[in-house]
Amino acid sequence: MDRRIFGLENEYGVTCVFRGQRRLSPDEVARYLFRRVVSWGRSSNVFLKNGARLYLDVGSHPEYATPECDSVPDLVTHDKAGERILEGLLVEAERRLREEGIAGDIHLFKNNTDSAGNSYGCHENYLVGRHGEFSKLADVLVPFLVSRQILCGAGKVLQTPRGAVYCISQRAEHIWESVSSATTRSRPIINTRDEPHADAERFRRLHVIVGDSNMSETTMLLKLGATDLVLRMIEAGVMLRDMTLENPIRAIREVSHDMTCQRRIKLANGREVSALDIQWEYHSKAVEFVERRGGDGDEVAKRVLDLWGRTLLAIETDDLELVAREIDWVTKYVLIERFRHKHGLSLASPRVAELDLKYHDIHRDRGLYYRMERAGLVERVTRDLDVFEAKSRPPQTTRARLRGEFIKRAQEKRRDFTVDWVHLKLNDQAQRTVLCKDPFRSVDDRVDKLIASM
């Protein structure tokens, strides 16, 4: 599939503190955050005029699901637009707190674990064809996804009985199955629940829930772009070496705990390889694949392959500074190590834990990642203007455009409506509904007529 539909869902951690002490419960904070949303949407589960979905997930976690995008850079832009939308809700909620005489700062964290050991996710969505065996697709992807954390982990200081350790992935400790239809109870690498949000006879939605949430735009580009390339190779029938893991769940933890990425993990055929070996194998095949298809014009693939290769080389040569501006877990590790050495702290210090958390704060004046971005210490994929526009403008080349235009007009005309990923409905006497099953289709006469009738 040369043109693919992508989507990202990010759950956010939330807290409210005053002078270091927790001030409000997550439920109370969530109510303040979503008060403005509920006032116009009459619900804490709404679709926005940029085509995205914003809602409160289990455990009072705000979740933002991007609109459908057909390019990885677009998806990165719309994911960042989600951060800005939530930051706006945060600022408004803090203003309300002050008006009501409640002292405290609200923090939204784009991470995957809290201090109590709970985990919340970043879910990636890739549209794939219905033809072919989904189980075979999953079999090839699992070793790639288990080892992919060395490219796109968010990093975490983990407190263990043997002391504090720096792990590559936040999510690795919370994954319990390779493939499953559950998302919360067993937390698989790939979720197999068959909800395509499209024509079920033509498409299937690959739902990957093993990845970390990323602050870094370049890490996000690599995570999504490398996965897309592997999918394209599988779809094109490229012969990939059998890398089936003997125990993927043990392997994902072993990889996360080994910053050298050299620890041997056992394959089902008895061979032993490292996470680096697995990633080099996929990378070399992807380079051949793009070259063979005359990929000179595919600038995104070239950028992905370049960063993929440089990241593996930086790890292999133990020269992480090579990608310290581009790879989340490396950026944060370098930041923590400099802070520790400057202040003479151990990895177990509460000040290090605070720094670890502040990296993920999406408030641009408080979050450490954004302070680094402002200082020019990290690389970008997006432009600020594009992110700002994406807060209210849907992608123009996918179904999201139809949804966004419908919502915008209905709100302007103060019409009651209901939408989901595939339906647009006017709640009038006629209950007119348009079913949009093709996520690639951005123009539809039926939708135009529905909009014109308002």
UniProtKB/Swiss-Prot annotation:
Catalytic activity from the UniProt record: ATP + [prokaryotic ubiquitin-like protein]-L-glutamate + [protein]-L-lysine = ADP + phosphate + N(6)-([prokaryotic ubiquitin-like protein]-gamma-L-glutamyl)-[protein]-L-lysine
Pfam families assigned to the protein according to its UniProt record, in alphabetical order: Pup_ligase (PF03136)
Record GO terms (molecular function): ATP binding; ligase activity, forming carbon-nitrogen bonds; magnesium ion binding; ubiquitin-like protein transferase activity
Superkingdom as given in the UniProt entry: Bacteria
Annotated function: Catalyzes the covalent attachment of the prokaryotic ubiquitin-like protein modifier Pup to the proteasomal substrate proteins, thereby targeting them for proteasomal degradation. This tagging system is termed pupylation. The ligation reaction involves the side-chain carboxylate of the C-terminal glutamate of Pup and the side-chain amino group of a substrate lysine.
UniProt entry keywords in alphabetical sequence: ATP-binding, Ligase, Magnesium, Metal-binding, Nucleotide-binding, Ubl conjugation pathway
Name of the gene encoding the protein in the UniProt record: pafA
Lineage: Bacteria, Bacillati, Actinomycetota, Actinomycetes, Frankiales
Enzyme class: ligase
Family: Belongs to the Pup ligase/Pup deamidase family. Pup-conjugating enzyme subfamily.
Ranges annotated as spanning the membrane: none
Other facts noted in the record for this chain: The reaction mechanism probably proceeds via the activation of Pup by phosphorylation of its C-terminal glutamate, which is then subject to nucleophilic attack by the substrate lysine, resulting in an isopeptide bond and the release of phosphate as a good leaving group.
Protein name according to UniProt: Pup--protein ligase
Residues annotated to bind ATP: R53, T66, W421
Positions that bind Mg(2+): E9, Y55, E63
Record: active site: D57 (proton acceptor)
Keyword Membrane: no
GO biological process: modification-dependent protein catabolic process; proteasomal protein catabolic process; protein pupylation
Pathway: Protein degradation; proteasomal Pup-dependent pathway; Protein modification; protein pupylation
EC number per UniProt: 6.3.1.19
